Amino acid sequence: MSYYDIDAILTDAEKIPCTFQIDVPDLGYLDNQPGHTLKSGSRVALPIWLAEMLAIANTGAVDMDDPSQSSKSFITFDLPPALGNDVVQALKADPRSVPLRDQSAHFYALATHMMELSEEPELSAVLRKTFVSRAAEIALHARKVGGGGSSYHGRDGGGAGGKGKGKATKDDNASNLGVGGAGEDFLRGLDEWERKLFRSAHDGTKASKEWMENVKKR
C-alpha cells in the first residue's frame, strides 16, 4: 500500500466510537463543551489514524494507590456502526443482500484495519464468507455485461456502485459497467475493493471476447 494511496487515506479518516480513559484539559469541544475539560468516560468519534495512536499510547503516569491504574491508555474504542451487530447479522443471513457501500465506501479496508487493532474472530469469518459469496455474484454480472461497448459512470466518476445517478455513455476504451434491475442495485452497493474486482473481471471478459472474435476472423 502506497503512502499516497487515496483509498488508504480515506479509510484512515473514517471515524470510530472512542471512550476517553482520563480527563483531558481544554478538549471539551470534542464533546460540545468548549473551554471545558473532556472528562474520563466521555464518548466521542475520532478518525482511525488518531484513535489508533491514542489507544496504543499510554499516560506514563504512576498511581501509587492503585498500580493497576498506572499507565492507562488514553482511550478505548469500539467497532464502528458499519461493522455493528445488525450489519454482521445481515451478512450472515445473505451477504449479497447488503449494500456495503451504504455502510462505508471502503467497507473491507475499514474492516481489515479494525481487525488489525483488535481480535474479532467472528467478524473475520463473516467477512471471508461475505467476500467469497459476493465475488461470485460480481463475476457473474461482469460476464453478463462483458461484451458491450458502453460505460456506466456515476456522478463521482466511479462507475459501478458510484454515488448518485449515472448515465450510459459510449466509450471504446472504458468498461461497460451498466446493468439493469436488481443487478444494478447490487452493483451500486459495491465497496471500493469490489468495484475494482468488477472492473478487472469485466475487462478480462471483454478482452477474451475480442480475442476470440479476432481468432475467428483469421
UniProtKB/Swiss-Prot annotation:
One Pfam family cited in the UniProt record for this chain: PSF3_N
The keyword Nucleus is annotated on this UniProt entry: yes
Source organism superkingdom: Eukaryota
Disulfide linkage: none
Gene Ontology CC annotations of this record: GINS complex
Region (Disordered): 147-182
Main location: nucleus
Family: Belongs to the GINS3/PSF3 family.
Protein name: DNA replication complex GINS protein psf3
Record organism: Neurospora crassa (strain ATCC 24698 / 74-OR23-1A / CBS 708.71 / DSM 1257 / FGSC 987)
Gene: drc-3
